[in-house]
C-alpha cells in the first residue's frame, strides 16, 4: 500500500471496541482502515459462550460473535488489515512491523490487553506444554488429570470451576488469604469439593523438561516450600494493556492503560489531539465486551467531531 494514501482514521485493534468504531466511522463516510493486531477479533474469540451480550437470549459463542461483527464491518466496506503496529509518529504516520507505513488524520487505539504471565524461568518454553492462560481453550486436554489455577479474581474462580467439571482435581494458588472475586464466584469455588485452595501461596519454580510436571510453591506467610505435582497450570492473574508500541507518545497510567477524559467534550481523546482510545487498553476495572463496544462507538463519534472541526 502506498504510504501517501491518507486515511481519515486508522483503528488499531479488532476487538469489540475497534470493530464497533469501524462500523460507526463507515456509516459516517469516514475513510477508515482497521489494523487487526496479534489476535484478530480480540480476547473474546477464545470465550466459548457469551451469555450477557444483549440480543442473544440463548447466548452466542465468542468466536462467532466476533466473526459476525467482523463481517458487518467488511459489509460496510472497511478494510481489515492483518498486521501489528510498531509505532506511531507525531504526524500520525503509523508504521507496521513489516515496514509498511500508513498516513492518517486521526487514530483510535483499541488494542485491548494481553495475558500477564508469572515471569518465571522456562515459562515461555512450557506454554502449550502444560501451561496455559485459557482454561476454556485447553481445559479439555486435561480430562481426569490434576491441574492448578493461579489467581484470585473472577477469571481465576471461573476457570477453576470450569476445569473441575472434567479434571480429577483443581488447586487454586492464591498469594493472598482472601479472594478478589465477586461473592457469587467465590461461593462457586468454596462449595466445590474438587477444588482445593492454597492460600498465601506463590509459584516460585516450574519443573519439567519437555512438559510441566510440577511446581514449587512458597507459602508467603510461614515461609514453607513444597512441590505440587501437576499435569497442567492455568495462569489467571490479569492482563497487561497492549500499549508499549505507543512509546511515550500518549500519557499512560502506571499500569499501562491509556489516560483519556481530560477533554470534557471529547472524553475518549488522549493528551494528544487526534488520538483516541477505547476498550481494555483504557478501562482497567471492567473488562466487558459491551463496555468496550460502547467505548468504541463513542471514540468513533468523537473522532468524527474532531475531524469536522
Question: PLM ranges: what are they?
Answer:
Residues 113-166:
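Glycine-rich dinucleotide-binding loop and its adjacent helix/turn
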Residues 5, 73-95, 101-104, 165-262, ...:
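A Rossmann-like FAD-binding core segment of flavoenzymes
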Residues 7-76, 157-183, 253:
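Beta1-alpha1 glycine-rich phosphate/pyrophosphate-binding loop at the start
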Residues 80, 109, 133, 197-199, ...:
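A structural signal for the hydrophobic beta-strands that form the central parallel beta-sheet
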Residues 119, 125-141, 237-291, 295:
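FAD-site-proximal beta/loop scaffold in flavoenzymes
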Residues 15-17, 39, 113-115, 154-155, ...:
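Residue-level detector of alpha-helix initiation sites
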Residues 291-307:
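An active-site-proximal "capping" alpha-helix that borders the catalytic cofactor pocket
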Amino acid at each position: 500500500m502506498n504510504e501517501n494514501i491518507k486515511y481519515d482514521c486508522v483503528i488499531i485493534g479488532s476487538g469489540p471496541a475497534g470493530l464497533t468504531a469501524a462500523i460507526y466511522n463507515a456509516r459516517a463516510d469516514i475513510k477508515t482502515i482497521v489494523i487487526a493486531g496479534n489476535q484478530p477479533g480480540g480476547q473474546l474469540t477464545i470465550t466459548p459462550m457469551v451469555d450477557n451480550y444483549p440480543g442473544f437470549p440463548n447466548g452466542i459463542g465468542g468466536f462467532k460473535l466476533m466473526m459476525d461483527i467482523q463481517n458487518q464491518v467488511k459489509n460496510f466496506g472497511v478494510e481489515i488489515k492483518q498486521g501489528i503496529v510498531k509505532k506511531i509518529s507525531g504526524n500520525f504516520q503509523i508504521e507496521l512491523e513489516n515496514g509498511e507505513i500508513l498516513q492518517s488524520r486521526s487514530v483510535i487505539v483499541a488494542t485491548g490487553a494481553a495475558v500477564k504471565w508469572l515471569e518465571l524461568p522456562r515459562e515461555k518454553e512450557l506454554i502449550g506444554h502444560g501451561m496455559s492462560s485459557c482454561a476454556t481453550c485447553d481445559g479439555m486436554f486435561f480430562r481426569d488429570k490434576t491441574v492448578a489455577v493461579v489467581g484470585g479474581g473472577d477469571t481465576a474462580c471461573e476457570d477453576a470451576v470450569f476445569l473441575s467439571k472434567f479434571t480429577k482435581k483443581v488447586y487454586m494458588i492464591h498469594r493472598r488469604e482472601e479472594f478478589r472475586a465477586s461473592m457469587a464466584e467465590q461461593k462457586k469455588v468454596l462449595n466445590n469439593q474438587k477444588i482445593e485452595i492454597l492460600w498465601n501461596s506463590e509459584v516460585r519454580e516450574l519443573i519439567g523438561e519437555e512438559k510441566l510436571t510440577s511446581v514449587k510453591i512458597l507459602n508467603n506467610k510461614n515461609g514453607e516450600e513444597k512441590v505440587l505435582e501437576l499435569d497442567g497450570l492455568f495462569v489467571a492473574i490479569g492482563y497487561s494493556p497492549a500499549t508499549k508500541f505507543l512509546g511515550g507518545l500518549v500519557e499512560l497510567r502506571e499500569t499501562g492503560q491509556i489516560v483519556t477524559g481530560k477533554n470534557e467534550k471529547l472524553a475518549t481523546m488522549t493528551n494528544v489531539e487526534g488520538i483516541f482510545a477505547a476498550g481494555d487498553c483504557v478501562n482497567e476495572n471492567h473488562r466487558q465486551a459491551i463496555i468496550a463496544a460502547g467505548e468504541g462507538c463513542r471514540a468513533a463519534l468523537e473522532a468524527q467531531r474532531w475531524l469536522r472541526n
